[in-house]
């Protein structure tokens, strides 16, 4: 006798500047997950934070057309453990929809920064990915660098600039020349997918890069450029075995 399917809520979109990236990612995830093993519940979150259970074609997700589709049902993630999943709006009111596992395919703030993970912990729902502490620490590049440094792990040389405490363009350029050298990369601290990131080779480009990064965040990281290969490593924790 075959095992019952696990019901998996797959979250995508999100109130984030990386909303579009999430829609691309989730399309691949939904195509690859084995539907013989899992009952998939795609849950789209709009930029304004509205949640919908989406039952339409996957092709409409990639470019955001799912938001104009009739195949959307308003829903929300219930923080009440007894509900163990979603609340879905029906003709006769809101009804619980049980979920076995939540798979967030969200990028950036409100998805990878520990906020969603906190909600899932309150709801006592199992989920894919890092916990609250790991998510929050890793989303903030400044805090992550401090933790790596404390652990003796080398990182690129750099410094953090806060909105409201930004030096004059001349002072900032002088600091770069004294501490890092050109070129440098300027990054919003709490974003991913290279949103708001610029490469600066002189004072004029540095000023423009700071202005761009501060559009997205109140804290900006300026780092030396390093030439090398980028290596990605996936880590899976199974019953305390990494």
Locate the predicted segments by residue.
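ATP-grasp fold ATP-binding core
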Residues: 148-149, 176-197, 218-231
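Hydrophobic beta-strand scaffold residues
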Residues: 40, 126-127, 155, 184, ...
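ATP-binding N-terminal substructure of ATP-dependent carboxylate-amine bond-forming enzymes
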Residues: 1-128, 132-133, 137-143, 147-150, ...
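Basic phosphate/pyrophosphate-binding loop/patch that engages nucleotide-derived ligands
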Residues: 147-155, 212
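Phosphate-binding site of ATP-dependent enzymes
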Residues: 198-242
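Structured helix-beta-strand junction loops
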Residues: 36, 123, 179-180, 216
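Glycine-rich beta-alpha junction loops
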Residues: 46-49, 165, 189-192, 226-229, ...
